[in-house]
Amino acid sequence: MTMSSYLINSNYIEPSFPPCDEYQQSGYIPNPGDYYERPKDTGFPHHDEPSYPRSNYTESGYDYGNVPATGLDDFGDGHHAQPQPVPQSHGPRLTAAPDGGAGANASKDCSLASEVYPGVAKGKEPVVYPWMKKVHVSTVNASYTGGVPKRSRTAYTRQQALELEKEFHFNRYLTRRRRVEIAHTMCLSERQVKIWFQNRRMKWKKEHKLPNTKIRSSSSASSSASGAQQQQIKTGQQLVPTPCTAGL
């Protein structure tokens, strides 16, 4: 509205340009001084005067709570929209909780926790797998099939030690298949059987005063090297020529 009134009430006049020479010769164009005449009064009010008289209308506050339902129903029929309830106030509504509401919420939370963690709610002990605890085999446990941590010392029973001694008496070295059979029969792990046989072989060598295989291999290598060196020295002495006598 402001833009249109500005265009109407402005004193700006669009300039007009003289036509071609042929129109000037015919006398259709007036004197050029007529183009710069004072603009005529168009009869419209200027900027200081309002275009329309201002009315005494006062805008009243709109109550959102008193919206008629009929208008919403008519609008919904035309545009397939469902009317929605309008809140009475823009602020949050604080309602007093009924008696036992907190208890109901707490029981609901407990039921959800019991569904997520059934073992904790029912008081059952958590499942502990064999690899989660240190095992010291003091009794024969047929149900145990797990391993043993590296730094734990195994206490063998008399029955286990006797069976291992019998096996060592016949075979000081075990194959993989036989080691698996012994471990399964005695409720031990393969590593336990392997370590027991290693310790038992070292003890047997000490009892029979047998040298260690590693020490014996190193000593044999050193003796062979020294023998080769002595042989080279002897061959060098044989190749040295004898000096000629001065008298001859």
UniProtKB/Swiss-Prot annotation:
GO terms for molecular function: DNA-binding transcription factor activity, RNA polymerase II-specific; RNA polymerase II cis-regulatory region sequence-specific DNA binding. One of its GO terms (biological process) is positive regulation of transcription by RNA polymerase II. GO terms for cellular component: nucleoplasm. Residues 23-107, 207-248 are annotated as: Disordered. CDD domains: homeodomain (cd00086). SMART domains: HOX. It is found in: Nucleus. Residues 35-51 have a biased composition (Basic and acidic residues). The keyword DNA-binding applies. Keywords: Developmental protein, DNA-binding, Homeobox, Nucleus, Transcription, Transcription regulation. Residues 217-238 have a biased composition (Low complexity). InterPro entries: Antp_homeobox_Deformed_sf, HD, HD_metazoa, Homeobox_antennapedia, Homeobox_Antennapedia_CS, Homeobox_CS, Homeodomain-like_sf. Residues 149-208 bind DNA. SUPFAM superfamilies: Homeodomain-like. A motif (Antp-type hexapeptide) lies at residues 128-133. The keyword Transcription applies. Transmembrane segments: none annotated. Belongs to the Antp homeobox family. Deformed subfamily. Sequence-specific transcription factor which is part of a developmental regulatory system that provides cells with specific positional identities on the anterior-posterior axis. This is Homeobox protein Hox-A4.
